[in-house]
């Protein structure tokens, strides 16, 4: 193992431990295998603008691990909505192998990449679905079937709520990973009321070894989402519940 890899492993270990996550050697190896597949596939398709090893570890892996303290019980079903290159779903699965994870994305070529990662990392109880959130949110096989939904997406919080809360069982939660702005929370009161959610916690922090600000918003689902939500594809983003 060369000096560069030792430095990268140290970054991953220390970054994860900042969120109370102690990675063993097997988990670290899986993260590095994931990094290699990501860089390999990124040559032929646009998965991430982040290509530097340190930045992948910090802005993708450790950023994803930051939600692990919220997941109290490990034997749960989690859906990652608009997962893209697998964040945060795959890192969370590596940390908590017992979780049952579904990775949802609207681009088929991304789900092919994700299936390759799952196979190479030999991950169990994790699968992909190529679909839009609006389609699967009304599907009885998906609707209110998950303890946790997560999204690390650029859509506004009212839009994410309509995408993600329909998947969550009453009593479960939606974890929204946002940048450094909490102003969207004010604009989400109507969506929360309509969709059956309430804000339980807002975690504000900097990513380790950086001045990159993050906000993680935890929304508890306290009643069923009305059957007319989510609305048809495109509607939530064009006409948010604000």
From Swiss-Prot:
UniProt keyword Repressor present: no
Pfam families (UniProt xref): GidB
Binding sites annotated in the UniProt record for S-adenosyl-L-methionine: 82, 87, 133-134, 152
GO molecular function: rRNA (guanine-N7-)-methyltransferase activity
Entry function: Specifically methylates the N7 position of a guanine in 16S rRNA.
Gene3D superfamilies the UniProt entry points to: Vaccinia Virus protein VP39
GO cellular component, one term: cytosol
The protein, known as: Ribosomal RNA small subunit methyltransferase G
Signal sequence region: none
EC class: transferase
Major subcellular location class: cytoplasm
Subcellular location: Cytoplasm
Enzyme Commission identifier(s): 2.1.1.-
Keyword Methyltransferase: yes
Keyword annotations from UniProtKB, A to Z: Cytoplasm, Methyltransferase, rRNA processing, S-adenosyl-L-methionine, Transferase
InterPro entries reported in the protein's UniProt record: rRNA_ssu_MeTfrase_G, SAM-dependent_MTases_sf
Family stated for the protein in its record: Belongs to the methyltransferase superfamily. RNA methyltransferase RsmG family.
The organism's place on the tree of life at top rank: Bacteria
The species this protein was found in: Acetivibrio thermocellus (strain ATCC 27405 / DSM 1237 / JCM 9322 / NBRC 103400 / NCIMB 10682 / NRRL B-4536 / VPI 7372) (Clostridium thermocellum)
């Amino acid at each position: 193992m060369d000096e560069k890899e030792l430095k990268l492993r140290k970054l991953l270990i220390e970054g994860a431990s900042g969120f109370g996550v102690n990675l063993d050697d097997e988990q670290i190896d899986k993260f590095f295998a994931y990094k290699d597949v990501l860089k390999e596939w990124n040559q032929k398709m646009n998965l991430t603008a982040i290509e530097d090893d340190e930045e992948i570890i910090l802005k993708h892996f450790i950023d994803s691990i930051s939600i692990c303290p919220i997941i109290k019980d490990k034997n749960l079903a989690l859906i990652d909505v608009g997962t893209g290159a697998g964040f945060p779903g795959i890192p969370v699965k590596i940390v908590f192998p017992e979780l049952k994870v579904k990775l949802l994305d609207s681009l088929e070529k991304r789900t092919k990449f994700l299936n390759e990662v799952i196979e190479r990392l030999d991950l169990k109880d994790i699968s992909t679905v190529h679909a839009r959130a609006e389609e699967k949110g009304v599907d009885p096989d998906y609707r209110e079937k998950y303890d946790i939904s997560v999204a690390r997406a650029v859509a506004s919080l009212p839009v994410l709520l309509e995408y993600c809360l329909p998947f969550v069982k009453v009593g479960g939660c939606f974890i929204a990973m946002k940048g450094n702005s909490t102003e969207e929370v004010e604009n989400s009161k109507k969506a929360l009321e309509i969709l059956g959610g309430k804000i339980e916690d807002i975690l504000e922090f900097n990513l380790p070894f950086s001045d990159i600000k993050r906000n993680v918003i935890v929304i508890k689902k306290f009643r069923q989402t009305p059957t007319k939500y989510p609305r048809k594809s495109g509607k939530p983003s064009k006409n948010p519940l604000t």
